[in-house]
């Protein structure tokens, strides 16, 4: 559209740009390369990656696309988004962006999503790390969750009330315990989606 001064692409967990498949024998195009190969390119690309060897791969890929404006941010996704990228994209800038957030685990923070939402200029696609959530916080008993996993989930969820979606109190032979709700995995994903819709109403 005529009023738009730029349409930018943000990849919060960029990886190498061409990761191996699970069989470790073939390579597939990762999200950065897919975005760069689009027929109608974005005006700017923001790739965030925290692992050094993956950053080197992204730098190599950058040389393959000399006509693309590519910025690589070495570091934590939340920090890079909140401090370096999101502030450059207020709605008043007349620039718009799409952010693809596909974390390997529970690194994403709700505060980051909230800051993105407040711009009203960035469309977000999130791949919720369901496997990481199931592995780390959907234990048989709430007391089995490690402090580190609990902290990660608190940051991802934005509050501590996610436990009410996963655990309920039941009487056992050893007294009352907070135990996992049978369908809590699906319920947790549904509730997270609903919370996203509250801050991204459109």
Per-range role (PLM):
Residues 1-84:
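SAM cofactor-binding core of SAM-dependent methyltransferases
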Residues 38-40, 116-120:
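Short, conserved loop/helix-junction motifs that constitute active-site signature segments
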Residues 140-202:
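A conserved mid-domain beta-alpha-beta active-site/ligand-binding segment of alpha/beta enzyme cores
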Residues 7, 95-101:
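Generic beta-sheet signal
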Residues 51-54, 103-108:
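Acidic, metal-coordinating catalytic cores used for nucleic-acid/nucleotide bond scission
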């Amino acid at each position: 559209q005529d009023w738009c001064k730029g349409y930018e692409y943000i990849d919060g967990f960029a990886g190498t740009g061409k990761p191996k498949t699970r069989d470790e024998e073939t390579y597939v195009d990762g999200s950065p390369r897919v975005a760069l190969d689009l027929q109608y390119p974005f005006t700017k690309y923001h790739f965030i990656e925290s692992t050094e060897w993956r950053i080197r791969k992204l730098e190599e890929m950058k040389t393959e696309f000399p006509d693309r404006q590519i910025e690589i941010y070495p570091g934590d996704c939340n920090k890079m988004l909140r401090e370096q990228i999101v502030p450059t994209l207020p709605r008043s800038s007349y620039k718009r962006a799409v952010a693809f957030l596909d974390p390997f685990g529970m690194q994403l923070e709700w505060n980051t999503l909230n800051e993105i939402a407040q711009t009203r200029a960035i469309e977000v696609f999130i791949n919720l790390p369901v496997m990481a959530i199931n592995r780390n916080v959907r234990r048989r008993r709430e007391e089995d969750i490690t402090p580190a996993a609990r902290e990660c989930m608190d940051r991802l969820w934005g509050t501590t009330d996610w436990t009410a979606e996963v655990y309920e109190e039941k009487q056992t032979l050893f007294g009352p315990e907070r135990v996992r709700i049978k369908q809590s995995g699906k319920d947790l994903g549904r509730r997270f989606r609903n919370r996203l819709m509250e801050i991204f109403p459109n």
